């Protein structure tokens, strides 16, 4: 579940979704809701408030039930609140390193370290790798992977492609312009836009000197580990 709007402010609905099979919850998207506020697609300016009382209760109930908490879209203060309120591994399912693209939607070095210390996984996103279309490449994508590894070790990184160019291209030009003004202009990696392109990433990881074991961890094993440990 990405954004807990379907719950309103009713924890009983969280339990109902759990019974229906939901095992991972991200509290917000890039907006405010009853649980907290999302991080914006700019270097600063996200709401400074943390989780609401409902959001804090929700986090505690997720941990009690065994629902994996995803911090991909939460604002910086909400991120800190979730870390403080929990003890189990956490994930950021699809993000990038602010070192290469400095927006609050991406993860700071300190946030990446928090996830690593908890035994969680940071999934690297195939969209927000660079503010410049010329450097939105698979090489820059691998730069993000290497940076996360430098902060968490090889067990702390995964793939979080978030492929959505096909959706973006279906939108009218006016809607694309509105999204660009409100969020940011996405720069898609030309040879990494759908799942059939995953082999291009594997080839690049080999070219960049990753071992077979490291590649397997990046592409599969780290996610499998966290799912087995927490779900």
Give short role names for the model-derived ranges.
Residues 1-131, 144-150, 156, 177-180, ...:
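Extended, charged catalytic domains and RNA/DNA-binding interfaces, predominantly
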Residues 39, 170-172, 230:
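Short aromatic-enriched loop/helix-cap "lid" or pocket-rim segments at secondary-structure transitions
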Residues 45, 49, 135, 188, ...:
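Charge-dense, low-complexity intrinsically disordered segments
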Residues 49, 102, 185-188, 202, ...:
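A general structural-boundary detector
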Residues 53, 73, 106, 135-139, ...:
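Soluble non-cytosolic domains of exported or imported proteins
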Residues 97, 165, 225:
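Active-site micro-motifs of SAM-dependent methyltransferase domains
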Residues 126, 152-176, 183-185, 190-191:
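Short acidic/histidine-rich active-site segments
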Residues 190-231:
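Mid-to-C-terminal alpha-helical segments outside catalytic/metal-binding sites
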């Amino acid at each position: 579940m990405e954004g807990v709007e379907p719950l309103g402010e009713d924890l009983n609905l969280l339990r109902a979704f759990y019974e229906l099979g939901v095992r991972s919850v991200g509290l917000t998207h890039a907006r405010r809701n009853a649980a907290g506020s999302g991080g914006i697609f700019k270097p600063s300016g996200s709401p400074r408030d943390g989780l609401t009382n409902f959001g804090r209760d929700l986090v505690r109930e997720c941990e009690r039930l065994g629902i994996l908490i995803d911090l991909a879209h939460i604002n910086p203060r909400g991120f800190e609140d979730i870390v403080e309120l929990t003890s189990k591994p956490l994930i950021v399912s699809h993000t990038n390193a602010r070192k290469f693209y400095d927006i609050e939607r991406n993860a700071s070095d300190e946030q990446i370290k928090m996830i690593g210390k908890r035994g969680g996984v940071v999934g690297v996103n195939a969209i927000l790798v660079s503010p410049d279309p010329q450097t939105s490449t698979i090489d820059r994508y691998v730069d993000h992977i290497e940076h996360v590894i430098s902060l968490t070790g090889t067990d702390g990184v995964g793939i979080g492609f978030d492929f959505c160019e096909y959706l973006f291209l279906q939108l009218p030009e006016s809607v694309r312009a509105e999204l660009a003004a409100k969020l940011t202009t996405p720069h898609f990696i030309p040879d990494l836009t759908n799942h059939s392109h995953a082999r291009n990433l594997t080839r690049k990881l080999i070219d960049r000197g990753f071992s077979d074991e490291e590649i397997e961890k990046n592409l599969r094993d780290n996610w499998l580990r966290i799912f087995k440990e927490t779900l």
